[in-house]
């Protein structure tokens, strides 16, 4: 364990690196679960939870008080474009400088490289902390929610384009899916970088259902689009909806969305969520037409 220089106040939080041992990972995830129960939003995204403790995974920082109980944590991923971090503070220890101590440690970890920090739920305390440390609001990820029935009605009658057939995912489709996902999300900083290993990690999750990953193929067998649904803990989500750029603006996206909503309705789901970038105008237009409404927002703050 390596420690950052302690703050001058004797009772201020101390922040230190910790090895990603199973006990440390379990402790951080338990802390995250407590924060989620209190805030109504998870402090870590799915990729973070999947890579915690993995070889080559993110750096872990823990904040401790005078009695060594963990007060908060930061998960820091290093990449070619700098570092990206997510922070969590135990609800029982907020307003005591823990968040500031963690963020200062993250900024020190960056050593002058660009820094991005996610604030899930756009908590007022996160906004104040970003202002105090000179981080700029750089990106917004919207969480939208809709009644399955209202969303389906909003789309109206939707048929697959001529020559396009739907099927469910099989292991033989994996490489085609990774290739199309990269094309469909070429400009997306996370989704477009998904590898075969990332896909395999998600396929191995308990929530994965191959029948909920709908594939649209042209008559020649080429994968043209997909709609991946996720149902976890009873909550349905439009996990990823992607269309080959060559097939954009031809109705395939709305037809895939409708097909997924029909599947959710058949399975008895009343409500569905999704996440979309705030500046993705075409996708937002589709989802607004389908009666999706704002539910929450995640904000990425950045220092260049």
From Swiss-Prot:
Amino acids binding acetyl-CoA 2: 241-243, 248-254
Keywords: Acyltransferase, Repeat, Transferase
Signal peptide range in chain numbering: none
Positions annotated to bind 1D-myo-inositol 2-(L-cysteinylamino)-2-deoxy-alpha-D-glucopyranoside: 46, 190, 230, 237, 275
Transferase recorded as keyword: yes
Annotated PROSITE patterns: GNAT
N-acetyltransferase domain residues: 16-155, 164-304
Pfam family, one: Acetyltransf_1
Enzyme Commission code: 2.3.1.189
GO molecular function, one term: mycothiol synthase activity
Positions that bind acetyl-CoA 1: 87-89
Family: Belongs to the acetyltransferase family. MshD subfamily.
Quaternary structure (record): Monomer.
Protein name as annotated: Mycothiol acetyltransferase
Organism of derivation: Clavibacter sepedonicus (Clavibacter michiganensis subsp. sepedonicus)
Upper lineage: Bacteria, Bacillati, Actinomycetota, Actinomycetes, Micrococcales
Encoding gene (name): mshD
